[in-house]
A protein has these predicted regions:
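Bacterial N-terminal signal peptides that target proteins for export
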Residues: 1-11
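Bacterial N-terminal signal peptides
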Residues: 9-19
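Short, internal strand/loop/helix patches
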Residues: 91-93, 105-139
Length: 182
């Protein structure tokens, strides 16, 4: 390999790594939101500043659709040191905007039960604003990977296939400094 092609090769790799490891200034930012858990505790986008967020936005009917991705991300998270786990925030959100006022108490109880089962606080989007502002699809399983700076690094809807799961895991590892994408 001659000297020029070597430097060209290095330049291409560095450019590729930079493009995928750091969101561009043009990356879409996650819209501000305010969501509430079944126990009444609230969470805003500002509360997640400096964290890598794994956001699952789903309905009661679609919450099991991407269990394979959830399992893989759980395995990855379980391998992390406690300090690293603090950086990676799992954010399950249920679209509660269709809840009738008569049944809000039951919805809140359900969020509490789901939180206990999941090991994470499950939040409700009670007015649908988070869904609409972040371009999540109604009545669908949505996943967003949000970088520490609040930019949406990856957004997808529907059933996430195995190949896409691998890509998401690589992006998460890259954002955490665990893997270089190339």
């Amino acid at each position: 390999m001659n000297r020029n092609s070597f430097f060209t090769y290095i330049f291409c790799i560095m450019t590729f790594v930079f493009v995928f490891a750091f969101p561009s200034d043009g990356a879409e930012r996650a819209a501000p939101f305010r969501i509430a858990a079944g126990d009444g505790s609230t969470l805003t986008m500002e509360d997640l500043s400096g964290k890598i967020v794994l956001c699952f936005y789903e309905t009661r009917d679609t919450k099991d659709k991407n269990s394979a991705l959830k399992d893989e991300l759980r395995k990855f998270r379980d391998q992390l040191f406690e300090k690293e786990k603090d950086i990676l925030y799992v954010l399950p959100v249920v679209d509660c905007s269709g809840a009738s006022r008569l049944f809000i108490g039951k919805w809140k109880d359900s969020l509490i039960r789901e939180s206990e089962k999941a090991g994470y606080t499950v939040y409700g989007d009670w007015d649908g604003k988070m869904r609409d502002d972040n371009k999540f699809l109604r009545n669908e399983s949505n996943f967003a990977l949000i970088n520490k700076d609040g930019s949406i690094t990856y957004l997808t809807h529907g059933l996430i296939e195995e190949r896409e799961i691998s890509l998401i895991l690589r992006k998460v590892r890259s954002l955490m400094g665990k893997e270089v994408l190339f």
